[in-house]
Design a protein with these regions (language model features):
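Enzyme catalytic cores with a strong preference for nitrogen-chemistry domains
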Residues: 1-138
């Protein structure tokens, strides 16, 4: 198994631009023989999104972009960092995109709340681990 780590300059609030960078990195990673690529934390929306997370239209745009990514990236498994809204709660999440769909989503457990980090203000802490299968490996 060859794993690629996408080192991207994600721009806060530029969901469409960040999605395009994720696709470009996935194409490059696949061309180099990777079967799995991991993107940075909140790569879809940029970090730290702060008060953008309080806007429903921003979260809607992230959801739409993630769905589009899942269908656009089909030949490599990609783990994408993004905000994930569930009801009234918002999670700092990472979703696994595989075979044209979202197969799993992880919610970050340990949210920092010091110095410039204020994640507890915006996110709910997750409570479950995530294990997924990739080419028969868990």
């Amino acid at each position: 198994m060859k794993i690629a780590i996408a080192q991207m300059n994600c721009l806060v609030g530029d969901v469409a631009g960040n999605a395009a960078k994720i696709i470009a990195n996935a194409i490059e990673a696949e061309a180099q023989g990777a079967t799995l690529m991991v993107t940075p934390e909140l790569s879809l929306c940029g970090y730290p999104p702060e008060d953008l997370l309080l806007r429903a239209d921003f979260l809607d745009a992230c959801e739409v972009a993630l769905e589009k990514l899942s269908t656009a990236i089909t030949n490599i498994t990609v783990i994408v960092g993004h905000p994930h809204r569930v009801g009234e709660e918002c999670f700092n999440a990472a979703s696994v995109l595989q075979d044209g769909k979202i197969i799993a989503t992880y919610h970050k457990h340990a949210l920092p709340n010091y110095s410039v980090f204020d994640e507890k203000r915006y996110f709910t802490a997750g409570g479950e681990p995530l294990v997924f299968e990739h080419f028969g490996v868990r």
